[in-house]
Amino acid sequence: MDGILPLYKERGMTSNDAVIKCRKIFKTRKIGHSGTLDPEVDGVLPICVGKATKVVNYLMDSGKVYKGEITLGFATTTEDLEGEVISKVKLSEPFSDEKINEILSSFIGDIIQVPPIYSAIKVNGKKLYEYARAGEKVDIPERRVHIEYFKQIFPSKFDKEKGQQTIYFEVGCGKGTYVRTLAVDVGKKLGVPAVMSDLTRLKSGGFQIGMAKSLSQLEKLAHENKLSESLYPIDYAVKDLPRYDLKLEQWRIVKNGGFLSVNTFKEDYDRVNLFYDDRIRCIYQYNKEKNRYQSERMIDLS
């Protein structure tokens, strides 16, 4: 069984937990996810099954959409509600939604982030959270990420008794963006400590949350021998690339890892999906130096 499963990952489990459960349901070890969701975050997690594992990197490179909450008034070690409170202030009055929207909009475009110390990013072969738990200091490398949009989806709420304000947001962002860090940086621009207090992934790899299946739904489909109904075709991961259907003689060349001339296609492509017998077989890319097309990823040679 080959294809892509948009899984609805519930809160309380790691992304690897989800993979392990899917392996049991699909009865195969050839399964992998396309981008970690923290345990306390729910939402769509694309899972690649069988030959679809060969396109997992394309899914990881795609944009993502989240909705969530930012709470102004305190900050934690983990930048979410899982960590210890490290700073706290009581807001005497709320920020206007006009001001909040102005701040959110200032993040649109390419920005520089310093990822949270409690993250799985590796520095010198060691994960950052391992440094944090050991109490060791480490220089966290900056990274450039892209924010497509960042907006409020509901009016903010002010808790006068606690002196805290909650912002309800939606963000479209590129690969590698830490939404926790976005929340903290919003607070910095407003001059107060902040934390990401809730998060749901709405979209990943082109899959909307409404397309996702829960583990209980998968178990039901497995019991009914209908698991294949949960899978999208492998080419869904690269659906934005142009498609070219190979002739038999071309397929024989491609199957053996051969090159294709620039005259093969009517248009100039940087990358192209190659199909044979109505199945995606591989992705070819243009080699400018050699003026030819060559394999970028072989997917299905059967």
Curated annotation (Swiss-Prot):
- InterPro entries registered for this protein in UniProt: PsdUridine_synth_cat_dom_sf, PsdUridine_synth_N, tRNA_psdUridine_synth_TruB, TruB_C
Question: Which Pfam families does the entry link to?
Answer: TruB_C_2 (PF16198), TruB_N (PF01509)
Active site location: 38
The catalytic activity of this protein is classed by the Enzyme Commission as 5.4.99.25
- Superkingdom in the source lineage: Bacteria
Q: What does this protein do?
A: Responsible for synthesis of pseudouridine from uracil-55 in the psi GC loop of transfer RNAs.
Q: State the protein's name.
A: tRNA pseudouridine synthase B
Question: Organism source for this protein?
Answer: Ligilactobacillus salivarius (strain UCC118)
